[in-house]
Design a protein with these regions (language model features):
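HKD-type phospholipase D/PLD-like phosphodiesterase module
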Residues: 1-28, 37-202, 242, 249-316, ...
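Structural beta-sheet core signal
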Residues: 31, 66, 210, 248, ...
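Short acidic, glycine-rich surface-loop motifs adjacent to enzyme active sites
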Residues: 31-38, 210-215
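Extended, hydrophobic alpha-helical segments in both membrane/secreted and soluble proteins
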Residues: 50, 225-230, 246
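Gly/Ala-rich phosphate-binding loop of Rossmann-like dinucleotide-binding domains
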Residues: 58, 233, 237
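Glycine-centered short loops/turns at secondary-structure junctions
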Residues: 61, 241-243, 381-386
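Long, C-terminal catalytic modules of enzymes
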Residues: 135, 254, 260-262, 267-274, ...
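Long hydrophobic segments that form regular secondary structure
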Residues: 193-207, 214-216, 227-234
Length: 432
């Protein structure tokens, strides 16, 4: 579907890729960002900042179009300050805002004034190359196993691909700057992405490797990814597919969120996980049989959490989706809260290279050696490398399905579950 794909396997590779793309631009540059601290030095590039990188492009005569998330919740500068750091010439800035606002007690449950965000991260250069995900900028985002100033690590992935023969993709990036536009394949989001992820899971023959910043999916959500995972494992048990494996990597701590929000995210993860166990048993298989095929993991190194921000689904080492979407109704429900964008990748050689890189990194295996799904499964269960099995994580006894279901139903609100009505997106030009 796309040719000449490069999968970046950590934030350093992502930074190197978007620096190279921007520095190579000759005519035009389109940049969409959820979080861009224009003053933050780019890792591996001395004191170079995104502000200077864009200024250099502007000085070369490159026409720059920025689609900016004006919310400051996660580290963006105030819009007025950000505009001072964007180039003054050859640079047009549009901001994207959603109609969702928090009111009443819901506002008390969140440190943010809004629950809708422009969350698409991409770069297009000269209608020849594009990068999807991995191109946000913030000091918390650091290369693999580089501790940031807040004492946690960061896991990031990105995709660079050639779009010279992709006129629909080129047109999407141009039109999306003016108004939020449904993406053409191989770009995906919302219902298309949700359906594809389910298809990848249900049609996997060897393994599913899933990494998600947030994992909120159960019988009360309108995304059915967790159900698809259980259904596929149940089928493996019934058909005696002893080789089939599912790897689910997510976060038990979200140190870039407030303590209150972090607590509720953990409860929702536990609710989803425990619901999957109950659903599997309802389908007639034991938990012992269930866990012969699936493992739930988080990442930790020397006592510090590794923030999973990679949001990728890999099927059998042959196909994958890398997306800005989280596994929640906010991104993949029937009424999404956030704008998202992902890419379908079918370059098997590149996917397998990435898969082996990730498995070797998680096992702290140096020099790298070939790792099979069966071997990774066994070593993941025994907490090798930076892998931590969720089954061995110390969690309060109160995290039962019944308790969390009752509590979250009582507190049912948009920041945690998703939206109850369709979001209207507005794009406005910033006048400077």
């Amino acid at each position: 579907m796309v040719s000449r794909v490069t999968l970046c396997s950590d934030y350093q590779e992502c930074v190197n890729s978007f620096v190279q793309l921007i520095q190579s631009s000759k005519k035009e540059l389109w940049y969409s960002t959820f979080l861009c601290n224009l003053k933050s030095p780019l890792p591996g590039h001395g004191q170079l900042t995104m502000s200077q990188l864009l200024q250099d492009a502007s000085d070369r005569g490159v026409q720059i179009k920025v689609l900016y998330n004006p919310a400051t919740s996660y580290g963006n500068l105030e819009l007025k300050e950000a505009c001072e750091l964007f180039p003054k010439k050859n640079c047009a800035i549009n901001v994207c805002t959603g109609s969702g606002k928090l009111k009443g007690f819901r506002k008390l449950m969140s440190p943010h004034s809004t629950y809708t965000y422009h969350h698409q991260k991409y770069i297009m250069v000269d209608k020849e190359w594009a990068m999807v995900t991995g191109c946000d900028v913030d000091g918390d985002r650091q290369p693999w196993l580089t501790l940031n100033s807040k004492n946690y690590y960061w896991l990031e992935l990105g995709v660079v691909f050639n779009i010279r023969q992709q006129p629909l993709v080129q047109r999407f990036f141009e039109e999306n700057w003016k108004h939020i536009t449904p993406p053409p394949l191989p770009l995906i989001n919302a219902h298309t992405e949700h359906s594809l992820v389910q298809w990848l899971i249900m049609n996997a023959s060897s393994y599913i490797h899933l990494e998600q910043q947030l994992f909120i999916s159960n019988d009360k959500t309108t995304n059915y990814v967790a159900k698809a995972l259980v259904d596929r494992v149940v089928r493996a048990v019934r058909n005696q597919e002893q080789h089939f494996r599912c790897f689910v990597l997510t976060n038990v701590r979200n140190p870039d969120d407030s303590p209150l929000l972090d607590f509720f995210i953990l409860m929702l993860l536990m609710w989803s996980w425990r619901w999957m166990e109950l659903y599997a048993q309802e389908q007639g298989i034991t938990l012992g049989a269930f866990y012969e095929h699936i493992v739930f993991l988080h990442l930790e190194h020397e006592g510090y959490p590794i923030k999973v921000h990679s949001n990728i689904v890999i099927q059998d080492g042959l196909r994958c989706v890398r997306s800005s979407s989280n596994l929640t109704d906010r991104s993949l429900g029937t009424l999404p809260c956030d704008t998202e964008l992902g890419l379908v990748i079918t370059d098997a050689a590149e996917i397998q290279r990435l898969q082996q890189t990730l498995w070797n990194r998680y096992l702290l295996q140096d020099p790298p050696q070939p790792v099979t799904p069966a071997e990774f499964f066994v070593r993941a269960w025994s907490n090798q490398g930076v892998l931590r099995n969720l089954m061995t994580h110390s969690l309060p006894n109160m995290f039962s399905v019944e308790y969390i279901s009752f509590l979250m139903t009582m507190l049912h609100n948009e920041p945690f579950f998703g939206n109850r009505k369709k979001i209207r997106w507005t794009i406005k030009k910033v006048r400077r």
